[in-house]
Amino acid sequence: MHEMSIAISIIDAVAAKAEAEHADTVTIVELEVGKVAGVEVESLKFCFSAAAKNTVAEGAELAVCEVEPVGECEACGQRFPVAFHVATCTSCGSFKTNIVSGRELLIKSITIE
C-alpha cells in the first residue's frame, strides 16, 4: 500500500507550509491526481486521515480532483483521450504517443488557519 507513504509525504509538505505560515490548523488539502498515476484515491484518503492524526492536518478534508489522461502523438501532434497506459493516435493511428496528462500527483492548494 504505497498510498500510506504518499499520504505521509503530503502531511510532511502540508505541515511544513503551515509552520512557515505560522498556522495552527490545516482545514483542506486539495490534490490533483491523474487517473493513470497508479494511486487508489479512496485508499489515499483513508491513509491521509490516519497519517494526519496528531498533526496540524488532523481532521483536514482531502479534496481530490482526478485528472483524465491525455495522449499526444509524436507523428502528427494530435492530442486525444487515453483509456490505457499504451495508446494509439486517434487521428493517424501511430503508436508513437506520450501521455501528457493524467499521471499527476500534485498538491494544488492548502487551506490553513
UniProtKB/Swiss-Prot annotation:
The keyword Zinc applies. GO terms for biological process: protein maturation; protein modification process. The keyword Phosphoprotein does not apply. InterPro entries: Hydgase_Ni_incorp_HypA/HybF_CS (IPR020538), HypA/HybF (IPR000688). Keywords: Metal-binding, Nickel, Zinc. NCBIfam families: hypA. Involved in the maturation of [NiFe] hydrogenases. Required for nickel insertion into the metal center of the hydrogenase. Belongs to the HypA/HybF family. This is Hydrogenase maturation factor HypA. The gene is hypA.
